Swiss-Prot record:
Cofactor(s) for this UniProt protein: Zn(2+)
Residues that coordinate or bind Zn(2+): 79, 237, 241
SUPFAM superfamilies: Ribosomal protein S5 domain 2-like (SSF54211)
Organism: Brucella canis (strain ATCC 23365 / NCTC 10854 / RM-666)
Alphabetical keyword list: Hydrolase, Lipid A biosynthesis, Lipid biosynthesis, Lipid metabolism, Metal-binding, Zinc
Keyword Hydrolase recorded: yes
Higher taxonomy: Bacteria, Pseudomonadati, Pseudomonadota, Alphaproteobacteria, Hyphomicrobiales
Top-level EC class: hydrolase
Pathway it works in: Glycolipid biosynthesis; lipid IV(A) biosynthesis; lipid IV(A) from (3R)-3-hydroxytetradecanoyl-[acyl-carrier-protein] and UDP-N-acetyl-alpha-D-glucosamine: step 2/6
Domain of life: Bacteria
Active site (UniProt): 264
BP terms from Gene Ontology: lipid A biosynthetic process
The protein's name: UDP-3-O-acyl-N-acetylglucosamine deacetylase
Protein family (similarity comment): Belongs to the LpxC family.
């Protein structure tokens, strides 16, 4: 457990396209002072106010997690937030050119590479953590998510798809920087070929491609020539998403998060439920 807050050594920029709008997008990561937190700002909108990376600022959870509202909304923050969280970075300003964080390769790997290229700086301020004191659970139909006390940071994510290629998969592991790098960071976002036309008609997935998505064909086979990176790559990516979504609690947590058939909305509702119950957690200093 890192005792002191961290930021990055210098600014670094990543460019690509937005997975939903398909337009060019870039993210410039800049160092920030201790106790700043993670701030997002639309650099393409004059005088736009920074938005705190916090569950209270979530604007939408349809296929991705969005922060802010109206014309200054920033979509698809989860892969970047997962990398930031896993690397133990507490303070950062993220300038976004366009309405989306670039999808890059559909994972957190490129964000980690960018941070590695500029280094991490330890700051003269202690880290704070959310320690889970009791179980908090949310349900939606046959899906659920819950926090419970645990001496560490653990994710137990289970998915269950009708598609036989995916089926029922579970990832259960304590997640620290090393685990995230090795087991989760390269797991790709995924989708079904049968959904493509519907998504396009809705103005979504316009930037999706085999370069940034794992695609399941109509015959339930992998369309990508390189196949799966892990036999359970699907649940690993869902866990990556959960790491990013839960980072919007505003502080790293000590406890276990479990979910069944979860997603961005359920993840965010679980965080909101936790933070709304002051008896369910305490804030501690490292």
């Amino acid at each position: 457990m890192n005792a002191y807050q961290k930021t990055i050594g210098r600014a670094v920029t990543l460019s690509g396209v937005g997975v939903h709008g398909g337009a060019p997008a870039s993210a410039r990561l800049l160092p920030a002072d201790a106790d700043t937190g993670i701030l997002f700002q639309r650099s393409d909108i004059k005088d736009s106010a920074p938005v705190c990376a916090h569950v209270s600022q979530i604007g939408a959870t349809d296929l991705c997690t969005s922060l802010g509202a109206r014309e200054a909304r920033i979509d698809t923050v989860e892969h970047l937030m997962a990398a930031i969280s896993a690397l133990g970075i507490d303070n950062l300003v993220v300038e976004i050119e366009g309405p989306e964080v670039p999808i890059l390769d559909g994972t957190s790997a490129r964000f980690i590479e960018a941070v590695d290229s500029v280094g991490v700086v330890t700051q003269d301020a202690k880290r704070r953590f959310i320690r889970i004191l009791k179980t908090v659970r949310v349900e939606a139909g046959n899906s659920w998510g819950e926090f419970r006390p645990y001496d560490g940071t653990r994710f137990e994510v289970e998915i269950d798809f009708e598609c036989p290629l995916i089926g029922r998969q579970k990832f259960a592991h304590d997640v620290d920087e090393e685990t995230f790098r090795k087991e989760l960071s390269t797991a790709r976002t995924f989708g079904f070929m049968k959904d493509v036309e519907r998504l396009w008609a809705a103005g979504l997935a316009l930037g999706a491609s085999l370069d940034n998505s794992l695609v399941i064909g109509d015959d339930n086979s992998i369309v990508n020539a390189d196949g799966l990176r892990f036999k359970d790559e699907f649940v690993r990516h869902k866990t990556l998403d959960a790491v990013g979504d839960l980072a919007l609690a505003g502080l790293p947590f000590i406890g276990c998060f479990s979910s069944y058939r979860g997603g961005h909305r359920l993840n965010s509702e679980a965080v909101k439920a936790l933070l709304s119950d002051e008896t369910a957690f305490e804030i501690i200093e490292a």
